[in-house]
Amino acid sequence: MSRFAEVIVVARDAEEVMEPLTRPDADREWHQCFTRVDDSVFAGTGTGSAECYLWVIQFTRHNWRGLLAHLEALPWPDPRSVQVLVHDEEDDCFGLWMIYDGRLTEVPLPHTVRRLHPDVSVTGTLSRTDRG
């Protein structure tokens, strides 16, 4: 099934934890790799600092079911800084997941509702309730 989904991971001091996810790994449930986004993108300098807080990935197939559980299980140096933003093809906006009590948990966003559709989407669809 062809379907687009974008995932952004924001986390402090997580370069070592995220680095393996920037390389192909046949043992993972998904095959795409995260791309590191360092501060050179924002500064326009072409060279970034050693610290990176942001990684992005786009899925073009419905093949990333294990991603959120995998991210939850990583040994994050600062779990309170971890934010995972997910935008599925049918979503009105990005959904936000954060680690609470060791679990990657969706944070309810104002004026949104998530409808689960396991046969269509990994996370369901996130719709704005304030649309006209």
In which residue ranges do the predicted regions lie?
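Short, extreme N-terminal segment that most often corresponds to the first beta-strand
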Residues: 1-29
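Short linear motifs in intrinsically disordered/low-complexity regions
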Residues: 14, 26-28, 39-40, 71, ...
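An N-terminal amphipathic alpha-helical segment
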Residues: 19-46
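Charged interaction segments
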Residues: 43-132
